[in-house]
Amino acid sequence: MTVTVTVLVPAQTANNSQSTVYTATGVTAIIDKFTATNYSGTAATISVNLVTSGGTAGNNDLIVKTKTLQASETYTFPELVGHVLRPGGFISTLAGTASAINIRVSGREVT
């Protein structure tokens, strides 16, 4: 077994349509840190799904629903830390506003 500490999702702006931002391709992934920053001048929301292989993002795998970040607020999502994605599982996000929230996810990949 090999464990690699890595950036699962490089810093990027969350889309305002449901979007896959990471897939555990051939690995088991463990989320260690998930950070979101609202860089806009007004409040904005973000939702996060952890979806099993072959699944579709929806209410059954919604972990964080419409978390409101105030202008310039950063949030580190303790509710996501320690979650495991089996091979083929993925992280999907949905921002309520375009061009408002940046995300970055770090963790471990196990092969």
Spans of model-derived segments:
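The feature marks short-to-medium sequence segments in extracytoplasmic or secretory-pathway proteins
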Residues: A44-G55
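A generic structural signal for short beta-strands and their flanking turns/coil linkers
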Residues: I30-D32, A44, E73, P87-G89, ...
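Ser/Thr- (and often Asn-) enriched beta-sheet segments in non-cytosolic proteins
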Residues: T4-T6, T45-S47, T66-T68, T74
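Intrinsically disordered, low-complexity Pro/Gly/Ser/Thr-rich segments with frequent PxxP/GP/PP motifs
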Residues: S53-F90
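Intrinsic disorder/low-complexity detector
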Residues: S17-Q18, S40, V51, D61-I63
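C-terminal interaction-tip segments
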Residues: M1-A29, K33, G54, L94-T111
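Short solvent-exposed strand-capping/beta-turn motif centered on an Asx-Ser/Thr pair
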Residues: A36-G41, G96
